[in-house]
Amino acid sequence: MKEFFYDKSFTQAEIDNLSMSGNEYENCLFDGCILSSVSFEKTIFIDCTFSQCDLNNVSLKTTALKGVTFNTCKLNGIHFEFCPSFMLEMNFDTCQMHYTSFFGMNLENIHFKDCDLKESDFSGITSINTVFDGCDFLDCTFDQSNLQGADFTKAINYHINPLKNQIKK
């Protein structure tokens, strides 16, 4: 049964018995929640904040993320490419995002600040006003990507082949 939550704060105790899949959350705060391997299939998050949450390996199949902020979260092994692009609006601050995939995504107006993106996949992405401020890209894959709208200010460990990717001239 689909539930709607508005302007609510969730801690781990409130999450333990809640079925997340298929619900809608608007203007909600998830603080210190352990949600690893949870299915968010067909879930809608609008103007929500995840702070110090463990979201490793969550399933985002047909999950809408509009105005969602992730602060100091663990987001390892997530496939963001399963989120519909028309509802995609996210920001990441000081997150661990190892083995995360953005394959083929349109990353428009998305801001990554001080994130650890080791071994993540950015193949086939299109970046429009995408900021990667202070991020670590150790062993990340960039292949057939349009990076002309990407800002890699203060980013480290990225290796981008200009013959396989579109970059600013």
Feature map (PLM): residue ranges:
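Tandem repeat scaffolds
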Residues: M1-K169
